[in-house]
């Protein structure tokens, strides 16, 4: 008779539709360290298991759980992205679905905490890897864990226990990872977003191909410069956003994303936003995060001009308010002042 873990895997795999599944076991040490073991890894290479091989390996996975280890799946496919949206509460999960995204699988990884896997076909272009990474980054910034990066990412295995020490119950047991939804489908909205991201890469590649040879000889990474006004705008928005946060730990990556969208609304271009984040964001952290700030600034500014485009349009009603925050006259007031000046200049002068 099939075990409950195998039944849950079969429902999950039928929905996600991956070609192979990497299985990772993580042992949580008493001192907080993690010991990681990838079941199929051999000579430094891991390709994952077919669904049939998972069935054969299930008894081994059950033994690992009895030893106190945590089990994870990573879906792998040559022609599909399987995007994990991690660390969602119920509100974020409902918003994801309300906004039109269609997860193939939804997991309750711990009580009140959810993970979703969205399947979307790769476009078959030279930019597939970058598109997948950008798609994961955009969706997690908006709905999940903004620190999560990369399109290929492990998630909790349904049917097995979440053995994080903080989840241990009074009787010594642990909550089981629950498969709440499993439906074989690909997400149309995520495909549209990936097409938009790919088109941006295609445009960049076309522009680069048109550059003269002397320009191509420059270093590949040209950092955007931040004007004084952009830096000042970042700092003003940073103080304003923090002032509006209520209790708990502030997610500074999400704060930077909010600032980037605000600055787009008030008319700063992508390069100026990127430069301001690169220059200002490291100073807002109390400790060194070991982050590549150039890449971080590029991704955050890009987010404001791609995935957050609908959000920026909705927030246009706050433009004048945010322009005042930046210490600038709203555009409408500038236009009125300009019109009044022209009217004065064209009016007949008074003679004494």
Swiss-Prot record:
CC per GO annotation: DNA-directed RNA polymerase complex
Domain of life: Bacteria
InterPro entries associated with the record: RepB-like_DNA_primase_dom, RepB/MobA-like_C
Keyword tags: DNA replication, DNA-directed RNA polymerase, Nucleotidyltransferase, Plasmid, Transcription, Transferase
Transmembrane segments: none
Biased composition (Basic and acidic residues): 318-332
Pfam families: RepB_primase, RepB_primase_C
Region (Disordered): 145-172, 318-352
GO molecular function: nucleotidyltransferase activity
EC number(s) on file: 2.7.7.-
GO biological process: DNA replication
Class of enzymatic activity (EC top level): transferase
Function: Functions as a primase with respect to replication at the (vegetative) origin of replication of pTF-FC2.
Protein name (database record): DNA primase
Gene that this sequence comes from: repB
């Amino acid at each position: 008779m099939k075990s409950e873990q195998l039944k849950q895997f079969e429902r999950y795999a039928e929905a996600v539709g991956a070609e192979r599944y990497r299985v990772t076991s993580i042992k949580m040490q008493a001192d907080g360290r993690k010991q990681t073991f990838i079941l199929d890894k051999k000579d430094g290479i891991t390709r994952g298991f077919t669904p049939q091989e998972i069935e054969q390996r299930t008894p081994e996975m059950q033994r690992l759980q009895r030893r106190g280890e945590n089990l994870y799946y990573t879906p792998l496919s040559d022609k599909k992205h399987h995007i994990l949206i991690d660390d969602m509460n119920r509100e974020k999960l409902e918003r994801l679905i309300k906004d039109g995204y269609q997860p193939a699988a939804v997991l309750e990884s711990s009580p009140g905490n959810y993970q979703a896997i969205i399947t979307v076909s790769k476009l078959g272009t030279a930019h597939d890897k970058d598109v997948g990474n950008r798609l994961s980054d955009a969706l997690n910034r908006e709905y999940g864990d903004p620190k999560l990066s990369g399109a290929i990412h492990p998630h909790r295995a349904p049917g097995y226990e979440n053995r994080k020490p903080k989840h241990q119950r009074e009787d010594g047991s642990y909550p089981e990872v629950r498969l709440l939804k499993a439906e074989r489908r690909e997400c149309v909205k995520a495909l549209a977003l990936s097409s938009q991201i790919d088109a941006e890469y295609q445009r960049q590649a076309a522009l680069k191909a048109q550059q003269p040879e002397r320009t191509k000889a420059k270093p590949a990474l040209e950092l955007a410069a931040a004007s004084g006004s952009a830096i000042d705008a970042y700092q003003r928005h940073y103080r304003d956003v923090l002032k509006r946060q209520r209790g708990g730990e502030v997610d500074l990556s999400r704060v930077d994303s909010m600032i980037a969208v605000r600055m787009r609304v008030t008319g700063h271009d992508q390069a100026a936003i990127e430069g301001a984040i690169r220059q200002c964001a490291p100073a807002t952290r109390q400790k060194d995060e070991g982050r590549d700030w150039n890449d971080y600034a590029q991704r955050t500014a890009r987010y404001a001009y791609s995935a957050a485009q609908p959000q920026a349009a909705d927030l246009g009603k706050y433009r004048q308010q945010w322009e005042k925050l930046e210490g600038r006259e709203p555009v409408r007031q500038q236009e009125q002042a300009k019109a009044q000046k022209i009217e004065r200049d064209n009016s007949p002068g008074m003679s004494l």
